[in-house]
Amino acid sequence: MLYLAKMRNAEGELTENEQKIASFLLAHVSELKTVSSRNLAKQLEVSQSSIVKFAQKLGAKGFTELRMALIEEYSVNREKKHDTALHLHSTITSEDSLEVIARKLNREKMFALEETCSLMDFDRLKQVINLISKARLIQITGVGGSALVGRDLSFKLMKIGYRVACEVDTHVQATIAQALQEGDVQIAISYSGSKKEIVLCAEAARKQGATVIAITSLTDSPLRRLADYTLDTVSGETEWRSSSMSTRTAQNSVTDLLFVGMVQLNDVESLRMIERSSELINLLGRS
């Protein structure tokens, strides 16, 4: 959906406040990565709900979705105007210096972290932590970059005494999923929420009575619809991406939050196990 064109063509249909919002977004589209609905409401002296309703009027689910779409549109339009530079990743081009690349990557990652944190439903997160802490078995699924995030989480959870199954091979993931039981938990990590392998594993887990927790984007997807609980992640990457850099940053922020929350549930024993694990690893390093 071309939101930039929609805003330009909708002048006659907008209220005074909506026109104010549209004018700001059109004038500052290149700076939207650092703009939140709260800050925008304050700056324009309108209510935060007015901004959300404006986004929905254009066809977006909320301001975050509208802003991300505008950023992507702006990036694509700029690429068309400057097609001598090759897009390497997101807004990074072949003409950027290493210093510029570093700044762009940092901005992209900061955006992902801040937006993921601002969208977090902490009551839901607390429920999820309690569920995972009581699970007989925790399965973690993911492919590609999401699989790396899953492996990191599985290692951390095993350090504090949880039984975790996290296999990279998708055939093995499916085999584990179909053997889950009521009381087990599957943590499915997929930003798109539409990876066939992850969706099939989630379906199998649900069929067996296990609880499915999805770490995914805000976009409506098969995984999002299947999950009992969702933990939302936001990435500042556009379609021009060479790797899931800020996506992994957002996912890691959620999995790290899960881990620390679970350590907090049983802090003394968890810290004792982490210390024992470190001692053993140090002994291995000396051999």
Swiss-Prot record:
Function: Represses the expression of the murPQ operon involved in the uptake and degradation of N-acetylmuramic acid (MurNAc). Binds to two adjacent inverted repeats within the operator region. MurNAc 6-phosphate, the substrate of MurQ, is the specific inducer that weakens binding of MurR to the operator.
Entries under InterPro entries matching the protein: Homeodomain-like_sf, HTH_RpiR, RpiR-like, RpiR-like_SIS, SIS_dom, SIS_dom_sf, Tscrpt_reg_HTH_MurR, WH-like_DNA-bd_sf
GO molecular function: carbohydrate derivative binding; DNA binding; DNA-binding transcription factor activity
Transcription regulation listed as a keyword: yes
Domain SIS: from-to ranges: 128-268
Keyword Repressor recorded: yes
Self-association state and partner proteins as the record states: Homotetramer.
Species this chain originates from: Citrobacter koseri (strain ATCC BAA-895 / CDC 4225-83 / SGSC4696)
Pathway where this protein functions: Amino-sugar metabolism; N-acetylmuramate degradation [regulation]
NCBIfam families from the UniProt entry: PRK15482.1 (NF012026)
UniProt-listed PROSITE patterns: HTH_RPIR, SIS
UniProt name for this protein: HTH-type transcriptional regulator MurR
Keywords: Carbohydrate metabolism, DNA-binding, Repressor, Transcription, Transcription regulation
Biological-process GO terms, alphabetical: carbohydrate derivative metabolic process; N-acetylmuramic acid catabolic process; negative regulation of DNA-templated transcription; regulation of carbohydrate catabolic process
DNA-binding region per Swiss-Prot/TrEMBL record: 37-56
Alphabetical list of Pfam families matching this protein: HTH_6 (PF01418), SIS (PF01380)
Residues annotated as domain HTH rpiR-type: 1-77
